[in-house]
């Protein structure tokens, strides 16, 4: 079947703050071994270079040791890629003015330490609680005056210190509780809230549902439009698909199943379509930034713990650190829907083609199309106010043939599509996602030098190129072997690799840059 689509760059458009993740691993990352961090967690993060990150932090009782560990993590991750950091804290119930004043001072002390002592200048946003929780989950949704009180004490303390951190309200979940934003507006919280936000998990719609996109986009549009008169933006602080414990799988053998249902019911590959159209709906509605829950799994329960929390783009299941299928779908959006880009306006009469796009200040642009048809679609795309002197790279996520990598490397582009005037023709397979982009540079990274192998450990000199992201390590039977996917043995951000295979061989190392060139 065939279809038509128009992609337009508007003369005036608000900035997009980027896609990313809730990085829950930030508080436990020192439990990781070098293989997990260097070859998976750090490697994938630098390859995707997210523009936005939400994390637990800014607790009033945070210790120096905990903050130092957190800061070291951020230096290796968010600071490397320039991601905006949004911290969400937690606290206990305080009653007196003295207690609340001390609470606000303690939070400000810790944020100052991170920003000024540890150099985390990208800590920009703070909220006092997760999902309006204090004594119990979400209880402040019914005590909004209490939320405002805590928020006000924080605002006054931050203002007194000229602390460059925005306060966010209300962080409510699910989207039916975004009405708390309306309460905040009506009750004087706009002057003390620089940004607003909320969460949502798709518990009422199966991955195959074709109406959720429309419904979610409308909810996002409603809250975005509600805030426009006050010049405030809305952030999707957490989003995800159905929670297993709300789908009749509350626990298994006493273990609470706080997991993404799609990862356990056989729909992991197909559900990537829904998570991506959820992200595109938010972009098209004018949401400023968003964080998928989560980047890495929470470690398996131990001791008296009983909750299994498995939502990560990357697994943390004992020693299984590999990528889930969503990496090759949502990961593409994270990489190419960059921070400080501007959303494009896309129109199509085909209800089952869900699309979104952004344009960067250098004129490069990216467009993602989710095909919900059960057959391929030939699309003629008309470009308005967009020009390209180079072909568009086409990246494909086919839910029936996921381009998985043993090393959690993003897939290569599979086609170069010429732009004939202002027209582009592309085929999107059934139940698939295509991303088209001119956001790249044809560049051959400099050769890696100083490669030395001894006793199964390979070392090399670090790349000095600014656009370097990670290394690929290859092993062959002769000194003149050609590096291929078949003889790749690792991807890493380190400058060394210990080969678990003791068999002798020859090694080569390549640099992979920001555009996937190697």
What spans do the regions from the language model cover?
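Substrate-binding cleft and catalytic face of glycoside hydrolase catalytic domains
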Residues: 45-207
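Noncatalytic carbohydrate-binding groove/subsite architecture in carbohydrate-active enzymes
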Residues: 143-275, 285
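Aromatic/acidic polysaccharide-binding cleft in carbohydrate-active enzymes
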Residues: 241-355, 360-364
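Carbohydrate-binding surface patches
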Residues: 349-399, 431-435, 461
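C-terminal beta-strand-rich structural cap/linker in extracellular carbohydrate-active enzymes
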Residues: 411-443, 507
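Pro/Thr/Ser/Gly-rich low-complexity, intrinsically disordered linker/stalk tracts
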Residues: 440-467, 513-518
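Solvent-exposed loop/turn segments flanking beta-strands in beta-repeat/beta-sandwich domains
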Residues: 463-485
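Beta-strand-rich modules
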Residues: 499-517
């Amino acid at each position: 079947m065939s279809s038509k689509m128009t992609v337009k760059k508007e003369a005036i458009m608000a900035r997009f703050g980027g896609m990313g993740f809730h990085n829950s691993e930030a508080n436990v990352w020192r439990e990781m071994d070098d293989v997990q961090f260097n070859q998976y967690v750090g490697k994938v993060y630098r390859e995707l270079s997210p523009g936005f990150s939400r994390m637990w932090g800014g607790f009033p009782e945070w210790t120096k040791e905990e903050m130092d560990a957190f800061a070291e993590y951020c230096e290796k991750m968010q600071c490397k890629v320039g991601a905006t950091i949004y911290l969400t804290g937690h606290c206990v119930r305080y009653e007196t003015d003295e207690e609340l004043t001390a609470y606000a001072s303690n939070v400000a002390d810790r944020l100052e330490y991170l920003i000024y002592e540890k150099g985390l200048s990208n800590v920009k946003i703070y909220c006092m609680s997760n999902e309006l929780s204090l004594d119990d989950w979400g209880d402040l949704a019914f005590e909004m005056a209490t939320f405002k009180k805590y928020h006000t004490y924080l605002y006054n303390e931050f203002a007194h210190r000229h602390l460059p951190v925005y306060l966010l309200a209300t962080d409510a979940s699910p989207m039916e509780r975004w009405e708390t934003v309306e309460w905040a507006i009506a009750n004087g919280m706009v002057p003390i809230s620089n940004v607003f936000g909320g969460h949502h998990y798709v518990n009422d719609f199966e991955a195959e549902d074709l109406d959720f996109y429309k419904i979610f986009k409308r909810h996002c549009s409603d809250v975005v439009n509600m805030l426009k008169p006050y010049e405030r933006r809305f952030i999707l602080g957490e989003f995800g698909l159905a929670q297993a414990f709300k789908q009749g799988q509350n626990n298994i053998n006493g273990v609470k199943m706080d997991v993404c249902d799609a990862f356990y019911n056989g729909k992991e590959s197909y559900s990537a379509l829904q998570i991506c159209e959820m992200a595109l709906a938010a972009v098209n509605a004018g949401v400023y930034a968003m964080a998928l829950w989560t980047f890495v799994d929470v470690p398996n329960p131990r001791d008296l713990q009983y909750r299994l929390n498995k939502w990560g783009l990357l697994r943390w299941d004992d020693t299984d650190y590999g990528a889930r299928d969503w990496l090759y779908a949502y990961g593409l959006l994270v990489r190419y829907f960059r921070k400080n880009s501007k959303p494009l306006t896309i129109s199509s009469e085909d209800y089952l083609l869900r699309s979104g796009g952004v344009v960067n200040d250098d004129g490069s642009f990216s467009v993602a199309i989710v095909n919900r048809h059960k057959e391929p679609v030939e699309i003629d795309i008309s470009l308005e106010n967009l020009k390209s002197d180079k072909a568009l790279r086409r990246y494909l996520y086919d839910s029936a043939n996921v381009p998985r990598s043993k090393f959690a490397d993003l897939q290569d582009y599979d086609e170069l599509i010429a732009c004939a005037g202002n027209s582009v023709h592309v085929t999107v397979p059934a139940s698939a996602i295509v991303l088209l982009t001119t956001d790249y540079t044809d560049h051959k990274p400099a050769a890696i030098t100083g490669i030395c192998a001894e006793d199964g450990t390979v070392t090399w000199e670090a790349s000095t190129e600014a656009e370097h992201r990670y290394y690929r390590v290859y092993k062959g039977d002769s000194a003149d072997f050609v590096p291929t996917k078949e003889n790749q043995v690792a991807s890493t951000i380190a400058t060394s690799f210990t080969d678990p295979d003791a068999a002798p061989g020859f090694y080569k190392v390549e640099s992979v840059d920001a555009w996937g060139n190697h």
